[in-house]
Amino acid sequence: MGMSHARAYHASSAFSIAGLVSRGEESRGRLSSEFGDMYPTFGDYEDALRRTQPDAVCISTWPDTHAAYATLALERGCHVFLEKPLAATLADAERVIALARKHGRKLMLGYILQHHPSWMRFVTEARNLGRPLVMRMNLNQQSSGSEWKTHLQIMQSMPPMVDCGVHYIDVMCRMTRSRPVRVHAIQARLDDGFGLPDGQCNYGQLQVVFADGSVGWYEAGWGPMMSRTAFFVKDVIGPRGSVSIAAERHESSDEVNAHTRTGALRIHHASLGPDGHFARMDEVIPTDDEPDHDELCAREQAFFAKAIREDLDPGEHLEAALYSLQVVLAAEESARTGRVITLDNAR
């Protein structure tokens, strides 16, 4: 994600890059050479903040550093674009949001699907299906090589159900416009000498119930053992019909563009005619002209710039981020304890 965001800033007329930070010498070199070594590079984040005095910071690091790095930037008066998840705990997430409000700085989260035109249409069509909704989603990734190394690093702090789940719970919240109230989850540790972190699971599935009666499930699994069968399910059913994303059949489950690309939207209408048969044919909406991953990151950064320039209120955006984080963390607790978790939404 960091490279894609750096490309977006490099190409943007709204931002000028003051410095690039990466703790590893090799990754720092790749980052610098991408832009012809034209920007200062740093191996230490705090040193970079002190020496460059930036107006804004983009944080695309491992999840367990997010809250601490965002705190350092906000305390220096910087606006912050922060990749998901907001923090590893709900308490830390709430503290970061409170700090942004205290200093009057913009805090934007990297919910990339909020800026994807096909996913925006997916949400809109789901809202037309009536209530309650049944939402079925997953993203399983059969990973190896560098992709598996990245997954192992992320799992040092959280399982895939949490890391990826915040995206899709956010989508469900936007589809229902309702509060999540109850969560249950299962998980499994699939390891045969692959080096999973101690105590960590690389497969999980959660079920969430919303206040309006809508229900959803989300499944995520990572690793060399994962099946590619039905790895990309994005399907919503309501009393009036259903809408589904038809994924491209040739996509690889660990290819980053496959995580957002839709292929087409299929809309099914439940209405019946006088003869008892369907009154309307299914609609297939092609989405051939979708933005790629770098373009989506550019759209995120354009919105970040707009939020700063026009002083947009990020309150609803941050509240949704808290809800999605609350659900996936509750799911992890449920899977660990075997209990159904009732959510406290008294904020």
Name the predicted role of every residue range.
Residues 56-59, 255-258, 290-291, 303-347:
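C-terminal helix-rich "cap/oligomerization" subdomain common to oxidoreductases
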